[in-house]
């Protein structure tokens, strides 16, 4: 019965919105298999940019790698350690990219070896254009050579930005990177970062494993709400091997409240988004650890069914209810309060595709079972309702035995 129900809810979920005119995100079977091997679930890891910007060096990267092991991040699933912009300074006479010798005196191969020795994967940044966003050498005209170089260094993940590329065709340019990566023979994740300017959800599946859907995130509640709203329209493009990327996490960077960070993390999990920490993981408060290391919320993000959650209730006064079907037949539900006051929100089983009758509800932030609830569709008490703090979230997993 559960398998039949799950098949039905996936069908309803996928057909909830009409196909976009011109949607061409249908990669070949071999491409689907290749991508699924690299990114069967959303990527997890750490990226230097949000916290450190250009203030990076090899000692920092070694300390971050050490911290990701000692603080439990690696065990929780955070695998990739990605160095963003500002690591490169020039090209050698043979055209090869050169890492900053002052900041990275041991070279990238040695640093990759260190990261790999910690049981982590190593990532680097480049740009489609001739220069990166910070004015360092980009990969335009050197795509093949750069991918060979990165493969020789042991790179596992490449983020490719879109600065100085206004006159270029994104599909053509990012395909160059895909083909160059394939020729190296090394499995390397391709992270497409053109900020959603050219509707990547329509063409990026089959080229990269993830693609940005908006401009850069900021450490503010307003930025989170804007990105969540933008990404909510593209859930049909996501799935195993190809993910919408609402950008790196800001959890722990100090610009939001604890409730706002929990909502931020919860919505990223509901949207099956890559979870790339962007804070200083070497020194985290107890609250930051509680958010980033919440195994129950991470499990929603990493669910193998690979469905991006969507909004099923959107109330005009600032409340939303999100749902995400899961591989075991249960449903994750996030009650989000966008308003400035505490709010009561509720859900009926029929609104999230569950059959009527008793269901077990578990709070994923309180880490406790809330008992058995029922919805026979007639009485006020026969639905799950909860109070949600301002700019906060209540996230539950609902499971029926039918």
Please provide the spans of the model-predicted regions:
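Glycan-recognition and catalytic regions of carbohydrate-active enzymes
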Residues: 245, 272-341, 357
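C-terminal beta-sandwich/jelly-roll accessory domains of carbohydrate-active enzymes
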Residues: 312-319, 327-402
């Amino acid at each position: 019965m559960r398998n039949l129900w799950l098949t039905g809810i996936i069908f309803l979920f996928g057909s909830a919105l009409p196909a976009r005119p011109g949607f061409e995100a249908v990669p070949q079977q071999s491409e689907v298999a290749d991508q699924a091997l690299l990114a069967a679930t959303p990527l997890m890891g750490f990226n230097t940019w949000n916290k450190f910007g250009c203030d990076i060096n090899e000692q920092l990267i070694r300390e971050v790698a050490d911290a990701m092991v000692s603080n439990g991040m690696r065990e929780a699933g955070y695998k990739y350690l990605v160095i963003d912009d500002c690591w490169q300074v020039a090209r050698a006479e043979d055209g090869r990219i050169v890492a900053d010798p002052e900041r990275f005196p041991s070279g990238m191969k040695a640093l990759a070896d260190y990261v790999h020795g910690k049981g982590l994967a190593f990532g680097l940044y480049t740009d489609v254009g001739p220069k990166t966003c910070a004015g360092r050498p980009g990969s335009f005209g050197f795509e093949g050579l750069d991918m060979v170089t990165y493969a020789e260094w042991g790179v596992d993940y490449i983020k490719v930005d879109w600065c100085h590329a206004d006159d270029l065709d994104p599909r053509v340019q990012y395909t160059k990177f895909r083909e160059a990566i394939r020729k190296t023979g090394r499995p390397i994740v391709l992270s497409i970062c053109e900020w959603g300017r050219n509707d990547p959800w329509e063409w990026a599946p089959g080229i990269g494993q993830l693609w940005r859907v908006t401009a850069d995130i900021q450490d503010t509640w307003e930025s989170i709400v804007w990105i969540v709203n933008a990404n909510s329209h593209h859930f049909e493009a996501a799935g195993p091997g190809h993910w919408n990327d609402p950008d790196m996490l800001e959890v722990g960077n100090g610009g939001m409240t604890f409730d706002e960070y929990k909502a931020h993390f919860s919505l990223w999990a509901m949207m099956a988004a890559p979870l790339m920490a962007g804070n200083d993981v070497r020194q985290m408060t107890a609250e930051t650890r509680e958010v980033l290391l919440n195994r129950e919320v991470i499990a929603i993000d990493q669910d193998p069914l690979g469905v991006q959650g969507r909004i099923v209730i959107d109330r005009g006064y600032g409340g939303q209810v999100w749902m995400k079907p899961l591989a075991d037949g249960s449903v994750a539900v996030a009650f989000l309060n966008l308003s400035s006051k505490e709010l009561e929100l509720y859900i009926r089983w029929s609104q999230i595709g569950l059959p009527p009758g008793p269901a077990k509800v578990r709070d994923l932030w309180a880490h406790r079972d809330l008992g058995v609830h029922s919805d026979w569709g007639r009485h006020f008490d026969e639905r799950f309702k909860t109070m949600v703090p301002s700019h906060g979230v209540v996230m539950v997993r609902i499971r029926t035995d039918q």
